[in-house]
């Protein structure tokens, strides 16, 4: 009867587990465990706390209030612009710059742009795509449905970079021409599907001082970390 009662009232305070460390007994209340995990950043709580012990793994996997708190905390985060990687082309890719978005603290002495010598490539979920190719790679074609969201002149010159945590779809040009300053500003677009609205943001402070060495700029984006809780259900 006691075991069944604990299962039915899993959200209530339960007797503390007892740990024996170097001859001393330490009691850790279950509600303290869940309180610590709920007040810790989601990626740390789910990935690290789940492996602390079987008890903590059970709390994280079975407590619906804990899972809902992670989702709620993510959804209530204020939206912000994306972070970008800029590749400057003077023929082959010889130099890249890691630039931070407008969320970077202004009026600081810390460099906001980091030079990365060498080639840069696109990536998906942490997997890099080599521009020079790979001999054993197999070419496959995937069919996709074509959905047009927003009518805009010259839309074929833009590509999708990803999405922000606020649900905005991010667009950038396939390539920006900075030779003779044809593209004086690096503009990116944010499309909001619910409102069917588009806003443009000029990314400033990212061009090198001497643009004569470069002809084109390619922009990549760094997506926000999104904690996946689906595997906990």
From Swiss-Prot:
Residues 22-69 form the F-box domain. This is Probable F-box protein At3g56670.
């Amino acid at each position: 009867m006691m075991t069944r009662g604990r299962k039915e009232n899993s959200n209530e305070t339960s007797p503390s587990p007892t740990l024996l460390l170097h001859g001393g007994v330490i009691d850790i209340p279950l509600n303290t465990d869940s309180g610590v995990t709920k007040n810790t950043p989601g990626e740390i709580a789910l990935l690290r706390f789940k492996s602390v012990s079987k008890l903590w793994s059970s709390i994280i996997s079975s407590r619906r209030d804990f899972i809902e708190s992670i989702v709620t905390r993510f959804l209530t985060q204020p939206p912000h612009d994306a972070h970008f990687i800029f590749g400057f082309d003077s023929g082959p890719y010889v130099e890249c710059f890691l630039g931070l978005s407008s969320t970077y603290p202004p009026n600081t002495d810390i460099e906001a742009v980091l030079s990365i010598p060498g080639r840069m490539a696109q990536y998906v979920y942490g997997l890099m795509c080599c521009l020079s190719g790979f001999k054993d790679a197999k070419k496959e074609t995937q069919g996709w449905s074509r959905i047009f969201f927003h009518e805009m002149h010259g839309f074929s010159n833009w590509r999708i970079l990803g999405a922000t945590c606020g649900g905005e779809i991010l667009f950038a040009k396939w390539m920006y021409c900075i030779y003779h300053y044809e593209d004086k500003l690096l503009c990116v677009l944010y499309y909001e599907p619910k409102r069917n609205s588009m806003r443009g943001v000029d990314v400033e402070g990212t061009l090198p001082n001497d643009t004569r060495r470069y002809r084109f700029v390619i922009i990549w984006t760094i997506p926000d970390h999104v904690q996946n809780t689906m595997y906990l259900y």
